[in-house]
């Protein structure tokens, strides 16, 4: 299709929708964003967040997408206003102890085994690396401003079906996240409830992640003004109401690993529903006379996959 001749509607204003809209608009496509929720009200806004590779289908494509995203985040980290910082990280956990290191870590030049003295009690091994950490409220504002600079505005417009957008534009990008379950009729999309506790930062500069196959783990993301602590994942739970018992467990675990967090005051408890799916879906599908490009099913890896998947969207639109 000829760039500039076809109107594009992007559905969704989370990190996937904004990034896709930016890539399309900066490539010359006229873009509109329709969203049920504005960026700061999306699940993306309550993410930790860090670029961190994890096993995910389709493996070969995901490997390329996370690598593309890493390159972009490294560039963004050169400007503090983006909310992206290259941050020292310590990761520990049973997946490391068994040697099953996450694919993609070879992309990090300074990844190295942690000295046993650096590994908290209860864990046998870990690794150090410098990873892109993203302060999501600040980052979403940055993306929104970058999108606005292209002349694109975000319209609050909930949809009942993709056909509504297909009637308004010949190209539709479905970045609806969990909403894709209804909009795309995809019963394989399910929520995974997550809860974070946000604390004041007592002077921490490192992020910590426990890698485990369990439903609860230890993590904290030390942003300049706050520390986001987690984590938990409850599959199939639709209720976003925070639970005080979960808050207490998160605080106890994180303060055991990092005693300085005992000095920090609780600012708020935040929750979100991660849009889980057996595999990430980035592919084209005709809807009536329109071309629909799906970009959803990222689960808890929306940030890590965002730029790679968005560039794939641009390629699919251009090849449509």
From Swiss-Prot:
<feature type="binding site">
    <location>
        <position position="14"/>
    </location>
    <ligand>
        <name>FAD</name>
    </ligand>
</feature>
<dbReference type="InterPro" id="IPR006076">
    <property type="entry name" value="FAD-dep_OxRdtase"/>
</dbReference>
<feature type="binding site">
    <location>
        <position position="274"/>
    </location>
    <ligand>
        <name>FAD</name>
    </ligand>
</feature>
<protein>
    <recommendedName>
        <fullName>D-amino-acid oxidase</fullName>
        <ecNumber>1.4.3.3</ecNumber>
    </recommendedName>
</protein>
<dbReference type="GO" id="GO:0009060">
    <property type="term" value="P:aerobic respiration"/>
</dbReference>
<keyword id="KW-0285">Flavoprotein</keyword>
<feature type="binding site">
    <location>
        <position position="42"/>
    </location>
    <ligand>
        <name>FAD</name>
    </ligand>
</feature>
<keyword id="KW-0963">Cytoplasm</keyword>
<keyword id="KW-0274">FAD</keyword>
<feature type="binding site">
    <location>
        <position position="43"/>
    </location>
    <ligand>
        <name>FAD</name>
    </ligand>
</feature>
<keyword id="KW-0134">Cell wall</keyword>
<dbReference type="GO" id="GO:0005737">
    <property type="term" value="C:cytoplasm"/>
</dbReference>
<feature type="binding site">
    <location>
        <position position="49"/>
    </location>
    <ligand>
        <name>FAD</name>
    </ligand>
</feature>
<feature type="binding site">
    <location>
        <position position="48"/>
    </location>
    <ligand>
        <name>FAD</name>
    </ligand>
</feature>
<feature type="binding site">
    <location>
        <position position="220"/>
    </location>
    <ligand>
        <name>D-serine</name>
    </ligand>
</feature>
<keyword id="KW-0964">Secreted</keyword>
<feature type="binding site">
    <location>
        <position position="274"/>
    </location>
    <ligand>
        <name>D-serine</name>
    </ligand>
</feature>
<feature type="binding site">
    <location>
        <position position="300"/>
    </location>
    <ligand>
        <name>D-serine</name>
    </ligand>
</feature>
<dbReference type="GO" id="GO:0071949">
    <property type="term" value="F:FAD binding"/>
</dbReference>
<dbReference type="Pfam" id="PF01266">
    <property type="entry name" value="DAO"/>
</dbReference>
<dbReference type="GO" id="GO:0003884">
    <property type="term" value="F:D-amino-acid oxidase activity"/>
</dbReference>
<dbReference type="GO" id="GO:0019478">
    <property type="term" value="P:D-amino acid catabolic process"/>
</dbReference>
<feature type="binding site">
    <location>
        <position position="274"/>
    </location>
    <ligand>
        <name>D-proline</name>
    </ligand>
</feature>
<feature type="binding site">
    <location>
        <position position="44"/>
    </location>
    <ligand>
        <name>FAD</name>
    </ligand>
</feature>
<dbReference type="GO" id="GO:0006546">
    <property type="term" value="P:glycine catabolic process"/>
</dbReference>
<dbReference type="GO" id="GO:0005576">
    <property type="term" value="C:extracellular region"/>
</dbReference>
<feature type="binding site">
    <location>
        <position position="304"/>
    </location>
    <ligand>
        <name>FAD</name>
    </ligand>
</feature>
<dbReference type="GO" id="GO:0009274">
    <property type="term" value="C:peptidoglycan-based cell wall"/>
</dbReference>
<keyword id="KW-0560">Oxidoreductase</keyword>
<feature type="binding site">
    <location>
        <position position="220"/>
    </location>
    <ligand>
        <name>D-proline</name>
    </ligand>
</feature>
<feature type="binding site">
    <location>
        <position position="13"/>
    </location>
    <ligand>
        <name>FAD</name>
    </ligand>
</feature>
<feature type="binding site">
    <location>
        <position position="302"/>
    </location>
    <ligand>
        <name>FAD</name>
    </ligand>
</feature>
<feature type="binding site">
    <location>
        <position position="299"/>
    </location>
    <ligand>
        <name>FAD</name>
    </ligand>
</feature>
<comment type="similarity">
    <text>Belongs to the DAMOX/DASOX family.</text>
</comment>
<feature type="binding site">
    <location>
        <position position="15"/>
    </location>
    <ligand>
        <name>FAD</name>
    </ligand>
</feature>
<feature type="binding site">
    <location>
        <position position="300"/>
    </location>
    <ligand>
        <name>D-proline</name>
    </ligand>
</feature>
<dbReference type="InterPro" id="IPR023209">
    <property type="entry name" value="DAO"/>
</dbReference>
<comment type="function">
    <text>Catalyzes the oxidative deamination of D-amino acids with broad substrate specificity. Enables the organism to utilize D-amino acids as a source of nutrients. Enables the organism to utilize glycine as a carbon source.</text>
</comment>
<feature type="binding site">
    <location>
        <position position="300"/>
    </location>
    <ligand>
        <name>FAD</name>
    </ligand>
</feature>
